Amino acid sequence: GNLWVGNEKMTMKNLNDRLASYLEKVRSLEQSNSKFELQIKQWYESNTPGISRDHSAYLQQIQDLRNQIRDAQLQNARCVLQIDNAKLAAEDFRLKYETERGIRLAV
């Protein structure tokens, strides 16, 4: 029994040491990653002159395009409505024609 307890303690200590080592490596890699990200950002900033991250110049163009899309959707809906109205009118005329034709043939 005591031998097993000693092994458990040793195993737990070993696992804790490995976990601590792993966490230290993760922390070190995160720091390195942050440094690399900063270097990359600085490189892009120094090697892409004149390019800004300000997209406000495009906002009006985006709004204009959205308005064009909305207008096209409205026009499309109007066309669909006109087509439906034309179909109803054609059906109405067909029924009137058949009614008149039936009356004439009956006379």
From Swiss-Prot:
Residues 8-43 are annotated as: Coil 1A. Keywords: Coiled coil, Intermediate filament, Keratin. It holds the Pfam family Filament. Coiled coil: none annotated. Gene3D superfamilies: Vasodilator-stimulated phosphoprotein. GO terms for cellular component: intermediate filament. It comes from the Eukaryota. GO terms for molecular function: structural molecule activity. Residues 8-107 form the IF rod domain. Residues 44-61 are annotated as: Linker 1. Residues 62-107 are annotated as: Coil 1B. GO terms for biological process: cellular response to starvation; intermediate filament organization; regulation of protein secretion. Residues 1-7 are annotated as: Head. Plays a significant role in maintaining keratin filament organization in intestinal epithelia. When phosphorylated, plays a role in the secretion of mucin in the small intestine. Heterotetramer of two type I and two type II keratins. Associates with KRT8. There are two types of cytoskeletal and microfibrillar keratin: I (acidic; 40-55 kDa) and II (neutral to basic; 56-70 kDa). Belongs to the intermediate filament family. This is Keratin, type I cytoskeletal 20. It comes from Sus scrofa.
